[in-house]
Amino acid sequence: GNTAFKWGIHDGYQWLQKGIASYECLTSIKNDFRKLLNPSAIIISHVSRAITKQQINQLISIWPTEVYWVVSQSAQCGVFNSYQNAAQLGSDRWASLIAAWSNVHEACLVINVGTAMTVDALSDSGKFMGGIILPGVNLMRHTLSLGTQLSDPILVGAYKNLPTNTNDAIYSGVIYGLIGSIERFYNLFSLELGRPIIRCIISGGDAPVLIPFMKLPIIHVDHLVL
């Protein structure tokens, strides 16, 4: 991901172990990885900086296993890619679309809320119809603090329907913006299909921040890509 490294061990039936670490701590978990059995396959989705890819390569070099780096395809695992340049679609979004399709096999929204928020549309035939990318909760707040001349430091506010202080106004504005974007995308995609979408899969570290404000038919999956 953009800010964290997530990993999991799967035996073909279930997840045996999962973990998460900041990129600053990748070196320190190498000893933990040495205690694991040699994996028969290593599959990686990487959307961060080139230097983090080097760190990941060093981390997994303890195993002789061949590594598969996920790259978006024109079609894969029953999902068809409508991006003008298929390879330009982020591997995390592509993996999420494949995971969502394997779960529901029908039209749905795929929402990931992390450093950035993505909202993607899957049709009944498994076709990725398109999607949007926005700053996530914290990035939107941080960007606002950098781009404005507020006299006081921005603190974490609370959501209010009608905020009466700056911190609450900023936090509430972020929620308004992200929820409003999801709902607009949901409505437009439902019109495109000719019926309401009955499943919206949501994942990502900040999904719990938005879920209380969502009035859509959501399915929360903690780690959709994994």
Task: Give residue ranges: language-model regions.
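Glycine-rich phosphate-binding/hydrolytic loop that grips phosphoryl groups
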Residues: 149, 175, 218-226
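Short loop/helix-cap segments at secondary-structure boundaries that form the rim of catalytic
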Residues: 9, 60, 77-80, 209-216
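Glycine-rich phosphate-binding loops at beta-strand->alpha-helix junctions
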Residues: 4, 45-52, 197-213
